[in-house]
Amino acid sequence: MVHPYLFLNFFRELLHPLGFSEAGADAVVYTWLIMIGLVVLSIAATKRLQAVPSGLQNFMEVIVGGIENMLVETMGEHGKPFFPLVATLALFILVSNLIGLIPGFFPPTANINTTAACAVVVFVTTHIVGVKHHGAGYIKHFLGPIAWLAPMMFFIEVIGHLSRVISLTLRLFGNMNGHELVLIIFFGLAPFVVPLPMMLMGVLVSFIQAFVFMLLAMIYIQGSLEHAH
């Protein structure tokens, strides 16, 4: 989808010689903008750490602490090593979703390449963790408990794991792209009245989609750590 109302659309011309489409250029530019913004925010929040947090430090500690608590509740204490990955994905997706509610900004998660990249990161991490934790025994996760059904179960499990990438990609992309299309249409019809309820709903959708993606990522990684039966 090519967004007609963007502040940074001049980057399209700069990235076109590199083979980027207009929609792809928008996603790349705003992805980098969000990453830089998150890095700057992190540096600002941790520049002068205090025992009793206040201001930006307090705000970030609430967010990070909430993500950590959810991770421990879902994966247990042994899930803490995966906190950096889970928190990074959650914050990036949440900010990517929310930035689309600001007129003139494009949500990278409304581009399927962005959501596919996040899904592939979860998929690859899941199986690297599984192999690292179980070694060659990780293959048992794909064979099932009955030996003579193992070939069929292997095929079914492989399809099931690949479908996770597709579901993670399309769920996030479909919701954010659809909402963006609705906002564009309503902004064209009634720029100052009709979009307001949709933008409020967009805030809710943004948080829900980030939460669902984060939760599924934790569940998939946790599944790779469990012993096959």
From Swiss-Prot:
Keywords tagged on the record: ATP synthesis, Cell inner membrane, Cell membrane, CF(0), Hydrogen ion transport, Ion transport, Membrane, Transmembrane, Transmembrane helix, Transport
Gene Ontology cellular component terms for the protein in this record: plasma membrane; proton-transporting ATP synthase complex
Subcellular location: Cell inner membrane
Main localization, broad class: membrane
GO biological process: proton motive force-driven plasma membrane ATP synthesis
S-S bonds: none
Membrane-crossing segments per the record: 25-45, 82-102, 104-124, 142-162, 181-201, 202-222
Keyword Cell membrane: yes
InterPro entries on file: ATP_syn_F0_a_bact/chloroplast (IPR045082), ATP_synth_F0_asu (IPR000568), ATP_synth_F0_asu_AS (IPR023011), F0_ATP_A_sf (IPR035908)
Keyword Translocase: no
Membrane topology per record: Multi-pass membrane protein
An example Gene Ontology molecular-function term: proton-transporting ATP synthase activity, rotational mechanism
Stored PROSITE patterns: ATPASE_A (PS00449)
PANTHER family: ATP SYNTHASE SUBUNIT A, CHLOROPLASTIC
Functional summary from the UniProt entry: Key component of the proton channel; it plays a direct role in the translocation of protons across the membrane.
Family recorded in the similarity comment: Belongs to the ATPase A chain family.
Subunit structure: F-type ATPases have 2 components, CF(1) - the catalytic core - and CF(0) - the membrane proton channel. CF(1) has five subunits: alpha(3), beta(3), gamma(1), delta(1), epsilon(1). CF(0) has three main subunits: a(1), b(2) and c(9-12). The alpha and beta chains form an alternating ring which encloses part of the gamma chain. CF(1) is attached to CF(0) by a central stalk formed by the gamma and epsilon chains, while a peripheral stalk is formed by the delta and b chains.
Name recorded for this polypeptide: ATP synthase subunit a
